[in-house]
């Protein structure tokens, strides 16, 4: 949605709000730009998505942050981590300097996650903890951004109960941060600017990347799948793909800067290119193009089984810098549960996809996500998830108890699965996850593997740590000069979720920048 469309739609949004007194935020505060609306967020229009490659910060805002510092606390997924890099880039362009000391920061931003209730509770606790800081230093600015900001209930709760917050902005208008900051400095009221409809694709946004070894590369925004449990299609908007030439240019620049690994990001990367009306171009085509660039490792996340094509499998099977690790969320192994989840595939079709992947990529490492305790999940249905895990032999899984999200269809479903039953099932599933992880890890004992050394181990500063191409954590002793390099490590010990090894040598570079 471009600027003109946003202004026009905001009239309709505000008119709708006038009909509903319980959502009239103005009775609490003087000035609100635009509050979120989940009903509006669900609509998927055919408005043209504009590509803005000329983003510039107005000169009048430059210097706003001189002699001021900022701190960003980030919760949630890789997309949020990427957004934080952009927010930090904008703040530094305004003159702010990053700090790790929350007690001295002049601007504190909390980049939030809405995927599970636990994440939201942590954010509200964090906001509450900042109340005393606001009393001690009333001139600081406290802001809430990210996916939680796109939820009406969250914004309403902040407006009513957390008056230490100065500004709220969403996922679609990060590029408006200079204007939002200026308004927050000038206004006595809380500033809220949350676009319920997605915005243009803004290129050339400044970024402050976390480190110089690995980088996030966003390839698309939003999700149109509307799984019944998921709030993301509401908080991130409809699917919008970046132009391939813009992505490829960014990857080439990262190669020139010496990055060793990139991860292509999207809520559903497999849908990449479907909305590009002037060309036929999908994720397989993009991976093929990037495979010719001198980035040693290329990952992508997150994949939806529905959109995983044979073309993609073929490209990954060619090897090169596309790693043989595929994260393929299954969520459940029972067809009835998958149907009410709105996952658009069956147990049988998922297993068929796994077979096609394994046939063409024999050395592939498959990992997954699983939700336990979906509304009315029976013991028999849960056991089908366990048997599917056995059939696939996943090397790892991220497992979760079902978390109700207001505004999703699943929130209206009656749930008769007691919490203690859900926890017991999760425990059984995690036991299986650990079992198969140990099997996968044990195969590495005695082998020499290539590891991207990322830094010191979290548990021992004298030990270095990094990951294999299949995302296995490896701990080993080596000179600190190896940080940021690809090295060969002989595996001496396989633990359940990590490997211990001995440094052999630095790997020789093979690729040439295209």
Curated annotation (Swiss-Prot):
Residue spans crossing the bilayer:
none
Q: Which UniProt keywords apply?
A: 4Fe-4S, Cytoplasm, Iron, Iron-sulfur, Metal-binding, S-adenosyl-L-methionine, Transferase, tRNA processing
May I have one GO cellular component term? cytosol
Where in this chain does the record put each MTTase N-terminal domain? 68-186
Record bears the keyword Cytoplasm = yes
* Record domain TRAM: where: 442-505
Q: What does this protein do?
A: Catalyzes the methylthiolation of N6-(dimethylallyl)adenosine (i(6)A), leading to the formation of 2-methylthio-N6-(dimethylallyl)adenosine (ms(2)i(6)A) at position 37 in tRNAs that read codons beginning with uridine.
Q: How does it assemble?
A: Monomer.
Q: What name does the UniProt record give this protein?
A: tRNA-2-methylthio-N(6)-dimethylallyladenosine synthase
Q: Which organism is it from?
A: Staphylococcus aureus (strain bovine RF122 / ET3-1)
């Amino acid at each position: 949605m471009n600027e003109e469309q946003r202004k026009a739609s905001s009239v309709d949004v505000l008119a709708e709000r006038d009909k509903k007194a319980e959502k009239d935020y103005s009775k609490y505060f003087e000035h609100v730009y635009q509050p979120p609306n989940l009903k509006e967020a669900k609509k998927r229009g055919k408005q043209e998505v504009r590509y803005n490659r000329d983003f510039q910060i107005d000169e009048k805002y430059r210097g706003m942050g001189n002699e001021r510092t900022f701190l960003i606390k980030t919760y949630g997924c890789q997309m949020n981590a990427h957004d934080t890099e952009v927010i930090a880039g904008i703040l530094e362009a305004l003159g702010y300097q990053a700090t790790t000391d929350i007690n001295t920061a002049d601007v504190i931003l909390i980049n939030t996650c809405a995927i599970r209730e636990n994440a939201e509770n942590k954010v509200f606790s964090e906001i509450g903890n900042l109340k005393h800081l606001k009393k001690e230093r009333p001139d600081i600015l406290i802001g809430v951004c990210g996916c939680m900001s796109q939820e009406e209930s969250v914004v309403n709760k902040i407006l009513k109960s957390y008056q230490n917050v100065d500004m709220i902005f969403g996922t679609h208008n990060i590029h408006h941060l200079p204007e939002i900051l200026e308004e927050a400095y000038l206004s006595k009221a809380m500033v809220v600017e949350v676009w319920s409809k997605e915005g243009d694709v803004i290129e050339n946004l400044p970024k402050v990347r976390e480190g110089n070894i690995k980088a996030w590369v966003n390839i698309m925004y939003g999700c149109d799948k509307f799984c019944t449990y998921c709030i993301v299609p509401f908080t991130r908007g409809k699917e919008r793909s970046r132009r391939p030439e813009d992505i490829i240019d960014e990857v080439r620049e990262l190669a020139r800067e010496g990055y060793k690994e990139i991860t292509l990001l999207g809520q559903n990367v497999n849908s990449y290119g479907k909305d590009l009306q002037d060309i036929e171009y999908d994720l397989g085509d993009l991976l093929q193009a990037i495979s010719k660039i001198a980035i040693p490792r290329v990952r992508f996340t997150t994949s939806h089984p529905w959109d995983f094509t044979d073309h993609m499998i073929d490209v990954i099977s060619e090897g090169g810098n596309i790693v043989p690790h595929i994260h393929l969320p299954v969520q459940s192994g029972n067809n009835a549960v998958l149907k009410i989840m709105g996952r658009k595939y069956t147990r049988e079709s998922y297993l068929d996809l796994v077979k096609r992947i394994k046939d063409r990529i024999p050395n592939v490492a498959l990992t997954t996500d699983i939700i336990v305790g979906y509304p009315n999940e029976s013991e028999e249905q849960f056991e089908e998830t366990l048997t599917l895990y056995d059939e696939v032999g996943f090397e790892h899984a991220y497992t979760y108890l079902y978390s109700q999200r207001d505004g999703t269809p699943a929130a209206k479903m009656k749930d008769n699965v007691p919490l203690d039953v859900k926890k017991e099932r999760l425990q059984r599933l995690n036991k299986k996850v650990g079992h198969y992880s140990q099997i996968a890890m044990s195969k590495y004992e005695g082998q020499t593997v290539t590891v991207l050394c990322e830094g010191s181990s979290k548990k021992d500063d004298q030990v270095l740590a990094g990951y294999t191409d299949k995302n296995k954590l490896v701990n080993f002793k080596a000179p600190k000069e190896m940080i940021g390099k690809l090295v060969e490590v002989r595996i001496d010990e396989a633990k359940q979720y990590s490997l211990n090894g001995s440094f052999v040598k630095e790997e020789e570079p093979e690729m040439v920048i295209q």
